[in-house]
């Protein structure tokens, strides 16, 4: 399905406009989140039942000053991003636009800048992944930009000892950390100067301050906030969850965790195509079943339903539903994930062990993990064993899968 690049909600840039908000905020939410391993764009990952984007947007909309906000989204999840914006912005929806991002972060920021209304003279660029950034930090950066007439970034002193090393790992020396800071977002700039810097930019830069400086702009650092850390890895996500739980008075997230186990077995049926782990395997003998016989997907469903206390796949879906005759495992996974979330749980992760002599999983493991992760909206890991040629799986008579799932009560 194709989408217009801009979801109508605010006027596009009007070069000479003076009426309207002077502050613009570009919220970059177009990242894939590959390192997080969630299978969905990082900004749509939940912390405490609320997406990172929603938390970031809530902080922005908490500003006392009127602002025009542009959320930059991946083209693959434009509708989902717009739905989050609709829910968070409410009556302020008219001041928030959603645009499609570029191939790089720099391209995404450029798209966001182009969508700001003409009255904006001060721009803040913020990563949606820094979801716990307090509203006060946005206000402080905006004030500093106007006071300095320069670029302004929040930062915190580097506390770890920093070493310089060569490509072989040989330590070349210790860096004096007294003048080092780790920078955060939002990063603020005079709008005209930032537009000019982007117009001249030829190389890719790691942040907007570097791009601004490369074009001759001056950048100042103001005190940052420990809560403005970026959620990049699973560890960062756990840290954010614990902070949210603490603030909500809900205690440790571990007290709300539940696990489940699921097992599924299907006999080989050479007359059928093979669907396993959400993938079609051309040239391989298929599996017998009412649906497509995807033992991996079915075991995952049972594990998730068990963890949430919802029963099992047979009791939920049955074999008498004509709509599910021949249905692919991805259909069951998406429906199961929806049931689990409707029951008040967040899916933390799923791990699956496949027992089979064929197909060989290793060459397509990463592809399968991406498909399965996207279907349940959480990280999925896949492993395989031939069971040393023992039993019905070792003889090639069938395929078995065992899955474990972890969910968290919200």
UniProtKB/Swiss-Prot annotation:
Pfam families: IspD (PF01128), YgbB (PF02542). Residues 1-257 are annotated as: 2-C-methyl-D-erythritol 4-phosphate cytidylyltransferase. One of its GO terms (biological process) is isopentenyl diphosphate biosynthetic process, methylerythritol 4-phosphate pathway. The record marks 35, 42, 290, 386 as: Transition state stabilizer. It catalyses: 2-C-methyl-D-erythritol 4-phosphate + CTP + H(+) = 4-CDP-2-C-methyl-D-erythritol + diphosphate; 4-CDP-2-C-methyl-D-erythritol 2-phosphate = 2-C-methyl-D-erythritol 2,4-cyclic diphosphate + CMP. Keywords: Isoprene biosynthesis, Lyase, Metal-binding, Multifunctional enzyme, Nucleotidyltransferase, Transferase. InterPro entries: IspD, IspD/F, IspD/TarI, ISPD_synthase_CS, MECDP_synthase, MECDP_synthase_CS, MECDP_synthase_sf, Nucleotide-diphossugar_trans. A divalent metal cation binds at residues 264, 266, 298. Its cofactor is a divalent metal cation. CDD domains: CDP-ME_synthetase (cd02516), MECDP_synthase (cd00554). One of its GO terms (molecular function) is 2-C-methyl-D-erythritol 4-phosphate cytidylyltransferase activity. PROSITE patterns: ISPD, ISPF. Pathway: Isoprenoid biosynthesis; isopentenyl diphosphate biosynthesis via DXP pathway; isopentenyl diphosphate from 1-deoxy-D-xylulose 5-phosphate: step 2/6; Isoprenoid biosynthesis; isopentenyl diphosphate biosynthesis via DXP pathway; isopentenyl diphosphate from 1-deoxy-D-xylulose 5-phosphate: step 4/6. The record marks 177, 230 as: Positions MEP for the nucleophilic attack. Its EC number is 2.7.7.60, 4.6.1.12. 4-CDP-2-C-methyl-D-erythritol 2-phosphate binds at residues 264-266, 290-291, 312-314, 385-388, 392, 395. Residues 258-410 are annotated as: 2-C-methyl-D-erythritol 2,4-cyclodiphosphate synthase. In the N-terminal section; belongs to the IspD/TarI cytidylyltransferase family. IspD subfamily. NCBIfam families: ispD, ispF. Bifunctional enzyme that catalyzes the formation of 4-diphosphocytidyl-2-C-methyl-D-erythritol from CTP and 2-C-methyl-D-erythritol 4-phosphate (MEP) (IspD), and catalyzes the conversion of 4-diphosphocytidyl-2-C-methyl-D-erythritol 2-phosphate (CDP-ME2P) to 2-C-methyl-D-erythritol 2,4-cyclodiphosphate (ME-CPP) with a corresponding release of cytidine 5-monophosphate (CMP) (IspF). This is Bifunctional enzyme IspD/IspF. It comes from Clavibacter michiganensis subsp. michiganensis (strain NCPPB 382).
């Amino acid at each position: 399905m194709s989408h217009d690049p801009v979801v109508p909600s605010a006027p596009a840039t009007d070069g000479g406009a003076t009426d309207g908000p002077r502050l613009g905020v570009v919220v970059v939410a177009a990242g894939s989140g590959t390192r997080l391993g969630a299978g969905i764009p990082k900004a749509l990952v939940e912390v405490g039942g609320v997406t990172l984007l929603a938390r970031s947007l809530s902080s922005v909309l908490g500003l006392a000053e009127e602002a025009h906000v542009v959320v930059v989204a991946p083209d693959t999840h434009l509708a989902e991003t717009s739905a989050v914006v609709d829910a968070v912005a409410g009556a302020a929806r008219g001041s928030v636009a959603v645009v499609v991002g570029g191939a790089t972060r720099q391209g995404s920021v450029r798209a966001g800048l182009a969508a700001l209304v003409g009255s904006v003279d001060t721009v803040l660029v913020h990563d949606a992944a820094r979801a716990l950034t307090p509203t006060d930090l946005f206000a402080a950066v905006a004030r500093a930009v106007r006071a300095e007439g320069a670029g302004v970034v929040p930062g915190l002193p580097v506390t770890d000892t920093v070493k310089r090393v060569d490509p072989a790992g040989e330590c070349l020396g210790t860096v004096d950390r007294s003048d080092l800071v780790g920078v955060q977002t939002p990063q603020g700039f005079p709008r005209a100067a930032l537009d000019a810097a982007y117009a001249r930019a030829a190389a890719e830069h790691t942040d907007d301050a570097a791009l601004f400086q490369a074009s001759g702009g001056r950048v100042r650092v103001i005190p940052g906030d420990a809560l403005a850390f970026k959620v990049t890895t699973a560890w960062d996500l756990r840290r954010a969850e614990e902070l949210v739980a603490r603030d909500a008075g809900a205690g440790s997230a571990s007290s709300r965790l539940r696990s489940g186990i699921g097992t599924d077995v299907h006999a080989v049926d050479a007359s059928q195509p093979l669907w396993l782990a959400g993938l079609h395997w051309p040239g391989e003998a298929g599996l017998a079943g009412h649906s497509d016989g995807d033992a991996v997907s079915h075991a995952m469903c049972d594990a998730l339903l068990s963890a949430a206390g919802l029963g099992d796949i047979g009791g939920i879906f049955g074999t008498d539903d004509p709509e599910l005759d021949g249905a692919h495992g991805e259909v069951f996974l998406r429906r199961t994930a929806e049931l689990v979330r409707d029951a008040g749980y967040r899916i933390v992760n799923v791990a699956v062990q496949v027992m089979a002599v064929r197909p060989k999983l290793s060459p397509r493991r990463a592809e399968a993990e991406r498909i399965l992760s996207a279907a349940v909206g959480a990280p999925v890991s896949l492993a395989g064993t031939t069971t040393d040629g023992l039993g019905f799986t070792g003889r090639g008579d069938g395929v078995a899968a065992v899955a474990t799932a972890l969910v968290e009560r919200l």
